[in-house]
Amino acid sequence: MDIVTLAEVAGNLNVVGYGLAAIGPGIGLGILIGKTIESTARQPELGGRLQTLMFLGLAFVEVLALLGFVAAFIFQ
């Protein structure tokens, strides 16, 4: 194999790696939002506080996706 072919394979693996890294935050967001909706349905008076906490958790979960995206570029 020549260098160009190896670079193409490494580039493709980075894309696959980011795709796998995005699965975790996607599942996390689904669970987070689902549980927030479930909790709001049980206790509607806490809806505002739960929504605030959900957005805070959403920010933390999205950091994982961004780290996966950045890692794909760093480890080329």
Swiss-Prot record:
It comes from the Bacteria. The chain crosses the membrane at residues 13-33, 55-75. It is a multi-pass membrane protein. Disulfide bonds: none annotated. Its main location: membrane. Keywords: ATP synthesis, Cell membrane, CF(0), Hydrogen ion transport, Ion transport, Lipid-binding, Membrane, Transmembrane, Transmembrane helix, Transport. It is found in: Cell membrane. The record marks E62 as: Reversibly protonated during proton transport. GO terms for cellular component: plasma membrane; proton-transporting ATP synthase complex; proton-transporting two-sector ATPase complex, proton-transporting domain. InterPro entries: ATP_synth_csu_bac/chlpt, ATP_synth_F0_csu, ATP_synth_F0_csu_DDCD_BS, ATP_synth_F0_csu_sf, ATPase_proteolipid_c-like_dom, F/V-ATP_Csub_sf. GO terms for molecular function: lipid binding; proton-transporting ATP synthase activity, rotational mechanism. F-type ATPases have 2 components, F(1) - the catalytic core - and F(0) - the membrane proton channel. F(1) has five subunits: alpha(3), beta(3), gamma(1), delta(1), epsilon(1). F(0) has three main subunits: a(1), b(2) and c(10-14). The alpha and beta chains form an alternating ring which encloses part of the gamma chain. F(1) is attached to F(0) by a central stalk formed by the gamma and epsilon chains, while a peripheral stalk is formed by the delta and b chains. Belongs to the ATPase C chain family. F(1)F(0) ATP synthase produces ATP from ADP in the presence of a proton or sodium gradient. F-type ATPases consist of two structural domains, F(1) containing the extramembraneous catalytic core and F(0) containing the membrane proton channel, linked together by a central stalk and a peripheral stalk. During catalysis, ATP synthesis in the catalytic domain of F(1) is coupled via a rotary mechanism of the central stalk subunits to proton translocation. Key component of the F(0) channel; it plays a direct role in translocation across the membrane. A homomeric c-ring of between 10-14 subunits forms the central stalk rotor element with the F(1) delta and epsilon subunits. This is ATP synthase subunit c.
